[in-house]
Amino acid sequence: MPYTGDYRIEAIGAAGGYDTQSNGGIYRGRGARMKGTFRLSEGETIHILVGQEGGINTVQSAAGGGGGTFVVRGSSTPLIVAGGGGGVDYSNSRYTGCDASAGTAGRTGHMSLAGGSGGQGAQTAQNRNLGES
């Protein structure tokens, strides 16, 4: 940081992917928007990892979720984290369950697959939604 002071930081998670066979690009899950003010010292370093858009699918199947965005003090102390939005499959309207939230647990999503917390997402395939059969 060039000066000691209070810095306002805003992070936005990436949008989820979509299916090109529909209007999914309009209705894909949106990333969370998080912001806060942090006291940082002159010479201190922060690192920023920007989440990438979720994978786009061309065969009318589920697409990948968006990546989270992370701002870290030094090499390992998180300041702010914004989760990415969920990917959608053949959507013709918005499903708010696919949008990221400010909470620490994952959301259920549109097809009722379990939202995860602490690395515990869906455990079994359901109607091809996990890329398994």
Task: Go through the PLM ranges and name each one.
Residues R28-S133:
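Secretome/extracellular-domain signature
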Residues A15:
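C-terminal reverse transcriptase regions that engage the nucleic-acid substrate
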Residues Y18-A32:
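Short, surface-exposed beta-strand/strand-loop-strand elements in extracellular ectodomains
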Residues M1-R8, S41-T45:
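Extended extracellular/luminal ectodomain segments enriched in beta-structured repeat modules
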